[in-house]
Amino acid sequence: MRLAEMTWQEAKRAVEEDRLVVVPVGSTEAHGPHLPLDVDTHQAGHVAELLAERVGAVVAPALPYSYAVTWIGFPGTVTLTAETFQQVLVEIVESLAAHGFRRVMILNAHRPNGSSVDVAARRVIDNLAPGAEFQVSALSYWEPGAARVNALRRSQVGGMGHACEFETSFQLATRPELVHMERLEGVHAPLVGWDLVAPGEPARTYEAWPAPSEAHPAIFGDPTVASAESGQAFLDAVVDALVEFVRRLESGAGGSYAERSTEVAR
């Protein structure tokens, strides 16, 4: 169910039913010569709706603007500062909490947002009274299912970064009319030193952001091996893992600082 399409009375009922609210977070930024600017926003919203269908959650409107400085030199990219982005998230979540929603998930689809999403969630909790009954999850949608996606990939490690096998396959599976694979001909898109789903990503080291050029067409990784079939498999894997994550929380597993049960499952 979509929050934006509810009346306020229906939203009140959702509060009374103690429904989880999923806040999808994307970006508006360059994604190579072959994908649209709204890839992250679309993917966040699409995954959120599939998750909501299975766990009975409410989906808030997807946030299309975030911390996208990496690609600000590429026309069409829109960015917020990290500070502004964090504050927007804090105020969105606090608004939901003020109405009585007790469970919120910030579902990110843009890797550079990760630290800001985490900071925003922590700030919301810091502002609560100790012992308040409220829980906010902060995660990127691929994280719970990363190992499953990694097992399905065709690219080498470093091939799943940005406008890559992962994102291109996702778009081929869901919006093929917006994907232009023919525009990748002759494009140089090397593997990169980090990867969305491979285990053991090293400590991050940052360098100056790339300038727009034919030599760097806003791609990190390898989109040439992407396919609709892979995209559907990736999508199924990440949604299944997210459902399992939500079910664990609903079972009383608690948040990151809850005491871990030592009881052996029987």
Predicted regions and their residues:
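Extended, histidine- and acidic-residue-enriched regions that form the cofactor-binding/catalytic faces
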Residues: 1-105, 109-266
